[in-house]
Amino acid sequence: MENQEKQLLKEILGFARSKKKKLYLVGGYLRDLLLKRDKPNPDIDFTLEKNAINFGRELARKLHAGFVVLDKEHGCCRVVKFLRNKNCTLDFADFRGKDIKEDLLLRDFSINALAIELEDFLEGKFSQTLLDPFGGQKDLKAKRIRFIHLSAFDDDPLRILRAFSLAAIFGFKITPETLKLIKVKKGKLNTVSSERVRDELFKILGTARAYDYLILLDKLKILKIILPEIEIMRAVNQGPYHHLDVLKHSFESVNKIEEIIEEYKASADVKNFLNQAVAAERKRLELLKLGVFLHDVGKPQAKRRKGGKTIFHGHERVGAHIARNIARRLKLSNDELEALSKMVFWHLRPGYLADSNRPSERAKFRYFRDSGNEAISVLLLSLADQRATRGRLTTQESRQQHERVVAALIREYFRKQKEKKMPRLINGDDLIKNLKLSPSPLIGKILGEIEELQAIGKIKSKREALEKAKKFIKENK
């Protein structure tokens, strides 16, 4: 625990004393301390007998911090304090029962049913005074997720999904008894808000073990509750280029993207790209894995027989539409929705570029232009898709060519990002003034053509640009 964090806790304790309140540290913060797990932006949970919302509001005022009520009915609020180089999230809640012991009894898993008085904690009496009535420390050492009471998933069905996110984050096993109860209670997940489901799903996707837990969630028939669209992907045969049906291929693609991310971990460019926040605390990494899993979601609807062959013409367009609907249901931001849709829509494009072995400058320019901010996501997705495709008609040569071309495109993208952007040779006013054009969609088309020719080195001056513009107008009359 850093000094600034400790000083903040001392301030909170002083304020609690002034209000004659006994504060307990509970749950995940204590669990993470026991695991020696340092978080760049700590979340600290507190509980007190009653009036947590009023306490939090007054504390926020004193600390000059942000404040929000999370759950008025159950007396939960949040205070957010910025400490030099980190955000500290402080959650306060009323006891769930009549006292701290009953509060711990009503928590989700043994590893989270931990508490200590804030005063004892700051006085260094951790091991002597830590409350651990359900063997949470023992379960932490054994690396297992275990429910506390039979009504745990009735009290909050989201805990069903949280069992998997905790297991994925920490590399723990869920006990057989807990899995058995989850199987019985899984239907209750339908009553949980989309936002809460999304957050736990993204926690799973953010780990290096997403593939394993998606497989387990599917085996337990939980994944189809979260993503019902995947059911029609099951057992859809894809023809001789594939060795797996659509759903199995989608799972295997997630497995491969996790391998690829590991291979690229030494690349600061790729690492920084994947760590970019797209919305709130959700990053490109999680969104990429969701895009990889959903890239062929349109295939069942697009499937046709033609000339004795199975084809999926237009599945990327159908899939992008389905992906947008999924994004809306999960309450993803507009930026996330657009990114997910682009990944699915353009996922075939790198393969087309790779088919030519040495794609032209024009083809590369158009790919980067069309895929925009998702150029790298689509390229990584394409690698995973290709590696998960091992039908009898695929060849070692074609696979190596795909890898070579896509790797070169990834390098080129980051190189171009670091280069100073070329100024435009002409703009709309130049076209109106020199070519006597009126404002119209034609101007946008001409400027797009000029930008492309400039990017691939075909024109280098304003004069050349205007000449090409004249030619473009003649050819498109």
Regions found by a protein language model. Give the residues of each.
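Catalytic cores of the polymerase beta-like nucleotidyltransferase superfamily
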Residues: 1-477
